[in-house]
Amino acid sequence: MKASKYILPTEKENPSDAVVASHRLMIRAGLARKSSAGLYFYLPLGLKILQKIKQIIREEMNKTGALEFDLPILTPSDFWEQSGRWTAMGKEMFRIKDRHDLSYALGPTHEESFSFLLKPLLKSYKDLPLNVYQIQTKFRDEIRPRFGVIRSREFIMKDAYSFHIDDVSLDETYQSMRAAYRKIFDRCGLKTIPVQADSGSMGGSASEEFMVVSPIGEETLLLCNSCGYSSNSEKTPLVLKKENVSSASVEKKEISTPGKKTIVEVSAFLEIPESTTIKAVTLKSEKKKILVYLRGDLELNLHKLHSLLRIVDSEPMTDAEIRELGLVPGFIAPVAPNDKVKVLYDRSLQKDFPYVVASNKEDFHTQGFVLEKEVSGLPEFADVALAREGDLCPNCNAPLKAEKGIEVGHIFKLGEKYTKAFGIQVLDQNGKARTLTMGCYGIGVNRTMATVIEQRNDEKGIFWPISIAPFEVTLVSITKGEEQYSKAEEFYNVLKNENLEVFWDDRDVGPGFKLKDSELIGFPIRVTIGKKFFENGEISIYNRKADKEESFVFAGFENLIARVESLRQELFAELE
C-alpha cells in the first residue's frame, strides 16, 4: 500500500477531550475519529487492526471446535421477557419500537437469541456439547461514555455460548475457553490476569474476568503474591484480623457528639480508630428497604449485597423514609431484625467487641456497645463489605495487593438460567428429558485494541505487536527526482512480493514528518532509504518496540529480505 493513495490523517496535537493514552493516540495516529459521545468512526488503519484481532479470535475459537454464527442485532422484547431481563437489564439496554408498536432491543448480548434459535435444533445428548459464537456489533447506553473506545456505546464483541448435558461437560468447555482466551490475548500482545468476578445480571454460578493491569482501569483487582489468588474486589470475600479486646474492659455509656454524624467526624472527635465504630447504611430497592451495619472503616460492596438479596439495583433511603422506621438520620443505632426493614450485619463485625455506635438520638453515641448483648435475635453475619489492599487472602491469609485493571474478556458458567427460561431439554442416554446447562464467553474487540495501546506506547506513539499491526513493515523513502523514486518503488515491490505487509510512505513531505508518523502509528519494522543510500548505499532498519535502528550497506535484496524476515520472526516469537 502506498501512502500517497491512502488516508493518513495524523495529528501533532492531542485531542482536547482525550484523557487516556489510547484515546489520544488512536486519534493522532489516524486510526479513528469521534462521531459523538461514545461513538467512533474507524479509518482504514484502525479497521485493519480490528480485522486482525477478529481473525486471531476466530482462529483460536475454531481450534476449540466452536461454530461461527451471525444473529440479528435487533432482538424482540419477547426473548428478554422470557428470560426476565427486559426489566433487569435496566437503562443500559437500548430499546426501540417499530411502526407496528412492537418493542425490540439493540442487543448488548445474545443469550436469549441463541437459546431461542437452538432450542428446536437440539434433540439428543448426541448433539452435545455445542459451542457457538459470533463477532458482532453490540450496544450499551452508557451513562458516561469515557476513555475513548474503552467504554463506548457501540462496540464489537465476540460472544460465545456453550450448551451441555451436565456440569462436568460445561467445566470441560469452560477450561478449554479459558485456555483459548489466554492464547488469544497472548497473540494480541496483552498480558492478562484471570480473576474471579461477579456474574451480575448474566447470572450463573461462576465467572472470571480477563484483566489487564493499568492505572486507568475502572476495576480494582486484589492479588495474592503468596498463593496466586486473584479476584475482582467486587467478588473478593472479606477476611480481617480479629481485634483482641475484651468487652468487659470498656464501660458502656452514652456520650455527647454534637453535630458529628459521619464515621470520620465521630472518630476524630472521640480520638478512636474508625475500625472500633459501626456504620449504618440505609438503602431501598423496588421490593424492600434495607439496613446494613458494617465496621466503620469499611465500605459497603453493592455487588455482594445485590447478589445476596437477589435484587437488580438499590438507592439510598430519604431522611423521611428513615424516620418512618423509627430511626434518626445520621444517628442510627444497631437494631434487631424486624418486618419493616431487611436488617443485615456484615461479618467484619465481632459479636463480642465493644464498639462505638450511634444512639438513635440526635448528637449522641454509645461506647462499649456489644452486639451479642444488646441486639436480640442477632442474625447470621453476611459478607457484604468491600475487600481492600492489605486485607487477608481468603485462601492463605497472606496480605492482598490491589491493582487497577481493564476488563478485556469475561467467561461465565451460566447454569440453567436461560435453558430453564426457554425450556431447552434433550433426551439423555436413558431416554430421560434433561434441561441443559450453559456457558457464556465474551471478548471486547475494540477494547482489546485500545488496551494494547495502553500497554504499548511511549513518548513517540504506539508500538504495535506485529500480529495486529496495520502493516508489518513500513518503507520510508526520501527521494529527489523520478530516478530515485523509481529505485524506491523497486524496493517496495521486492518487499511486497515476499508476502510481507508493506506500507510505503511515498508522500511528497519532509523526512522528519515521515519518520515521526511511522513512530506515531507504530509500524513494527521500518526500512529507510534516503540520501545516504543514494550516496553510499546505506540502509537502516528500525525496530519500533526496541526503539533501536541499525544501519548497514545494501548488499542486495536477498540480504535485505533476510534481515527484515529475521526481525519479523523475532517479533512474532515474543508473542508465543
UniProtKB/Swiss-Prot annotation:
Q: Sorted alphabetically, which keywords does the UniProt record give?
A: Aminoacyl-tRNA synthetase, ATP-binding, Cytoplasm, Ligase, Nucleotide-binding, Protein biosynthesis
What reaction does this catalyse?
A: tRNA(Pro) + L-proline + ATP = L-prolyl-tRNA(Pro) + AMP + diphosphate
Annotated GO CC locations:
cytosol
**SUPFAM superfamilies hit by this protein:** Class II aaRS ABD-related (SSF52954), Class II aaRS and biotin synthetases (SSF55681), YbaK/ProRS associated domain (SSF55826)
Write one Pfam family the protein is assigned to: HGTP_anticodon
BP-aspect Gene Ontology terms = prolyl-tRNA aminoacylation
| InterPro entries cross-referenced by the UniProt entry | aa-tRNA-synt_IIb, aa-tRNA-synth_II, aa-tRNA-synth_II/BPL/LPL, Anticodon-bd, Anticodon-bd_dom_sf, Pro-tRNA-ligase_IIa, Pro-tRNA-synth_IIa_bac-type, Pro-tRNA-Synthase_IIa_type1
Major place of residence: cytoplasm
Q: Which GO terms describe its molecular function?
A: aminoacyl-tRNA deacylase activity; ATP binding; proline-tRNA ligase activity
What EC number(s) is this enzyme filed under?
A: 6.1.1.15
**Per its UniProt record, what NCBIfam families does this chain match?**
PRK09194.1, proS_fam_II
The role this protein plays is: Catalyzes the attachment of proline to tRNA(Pro) in a two-step reaction: proline is first activated by ATP to form Pro-AMP and then transferred to the acceptor end of tRNA(Pro). As ProRS can inadvertently accommodate and process non-cognate amino acids such as alanine and cysteine, to avoid such errors it has two additional distinct editing activities against alanine. One activity is designated as 'pretransfer' editing and involves the tRNA(Pro)-independent hydrolysis of activated Ala-AMP.
Query: What is its quaternary makeup?
Result: Homodimer.
What family does the entry list? Belongs to the class-II aminoacyl-tRNA synthetase family. ProS type 1 subfamily.
Protein name per the record: Proline--tRNA ligase
